[in-house]
Amino acid sequence: MLHTQVPEEEGVELRRTADGKGDGVLATRSFAAGETVLVGFLVGPLTGNDSHATQMGPGRWARHGGLGPKVNHSCDPNCGVRLNDGQAFDIVARQPIGAGQELTFDYAMRNFTIDHFPAVCLCGAARCRGSVTGWKDLPATRKANYGELVAPYLRTMDDEIRRALTEGGR
């Protein structure tokens, strides 16, 4: 059994998931809604997008260190992301999380488009979209439900697209 604990990431550990889908980050203690579960940090910029890249803005990607990249996707996640002072994304609880629960976030919370995942989503959530998609493909209700726990540039891009459509329709 894979079992890794990083001192800076107390309260979580990397393990095999109970559903047999592979590795996941699980809580080893309870977290309250709004609590930072993992503090994000960057290990370097990237020249393009890949399956472990984090989109930092239009045409910009970086690689996160620690256990953050090991947090799995869910179409109905218990976590979201918040940009920190180091320009990395913290993983933040969207709801109470109990010890033993797997941490998940929607990869669309920090990627406008996603082109590097399998066509079929394996999250198993009741609200599963069927595929891992980017922010641009989310319905407005889902975007609103995520509140502020998404990459800020995504909201800016939505505003720019709306503005362009409004100006183009005049």
Give the positions of each predicted feature.
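Conserved catalytic SET/PR domain of SAM-dependent protein methyltransferases, capturing the structural core
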Residues: M1-R170
